[in-house]
Amino acid sequence: MIQQERLLKVLKAPHISEKATKNAEKGNTIVFKVALDANKVEVANAVQELFEVKVDSVRTVVVKGKTKRHGARMGRRSDWKKAYVTLQEGQSLDFVEGAAE
C-alpha cells in the first residue's frame, strides 16, 4: 500500500469545469488535478482510501502550460496533470453539487 503522506500528495484538488460537470452527471466520472509524477495506480488508491469509494478506471492526461506574455517578456505556465476517475456503479462523490450552490 501507499504511505499516508504520499496519498495526500497525489490528489491536489477536484477540477471543476463544464466538461467535468457533464462527465460527473452522465458517466459517474470525477476529474482531479493530480501530481505530475503520480501514476494511475496511485490515483486509484488515493481516491479509494481518502473518499471510501470503489474506483472502476482511471485515465490521465498531462495538460501543457500555455505561453503567456508579461509586458515585453514571454513566460510559460507550468504543466499539470489531471485524472478522470470513473467510479463503480452505485458509488458517488458530489464535488460538483457543492460548487454550484
Curated annotation (Swiss-Prot):
Under InterPro entries, the record lists: Nucleotide-bd_a/b_plait_sf (IPR012677), Ribosomal_uL23-like (IPR013025), Ribosomal_uL23/eL15/eS24_sf (IPR012678), Ribosomal_uL23_CS (IPR001014)
Q: What domain of life is recorded for the organism?
A: Bacteria
Q: Which GO terms describe its cellular component?
A: ribonucleoprotein complex; ribosome
Annotated GO MF terms: rRNA binding; structural constituent of ribosome
- Give the signal peptide as a residue range, or say none if absent: none
All disulfide bonds of the chain are: none
Give an example GO biological process. translation
Q: Which Gene3D superfamilies match?
A: 3.30.70.330
Q: Which UniProt keywords apply?
A: Ribonucleoprotein, Ribosomal protein, RNA-binding, rRNA-binding
Q: Which Pfam families does the annotation name?
A: Ribosomal_L23
Q: Which family does it belong to?
A: Belongs to the universal ribosomal protein uL23 family.
| Function (record text) | One of the early assembly proteins it binds 23S rRNA. One of the proteins that surrounds the polypeptide exit tunnel on the outside of the ribosome. Forms the main docking site for trigger factor binding to the ribosome.
Q: How does it assemble?
A: Part of the 50S ribosomal subunit. Contacts protein L29, and trigger factor when it is bound to the ribosome.
HAMAP family according to UniProt: Ribosomal_uL23_B
**What is this protein identified as?**
Large ribosomal subunit protein uL23
Biological source species: Haemophilus ducreyi (strain 35000HP / ATCC 700724)
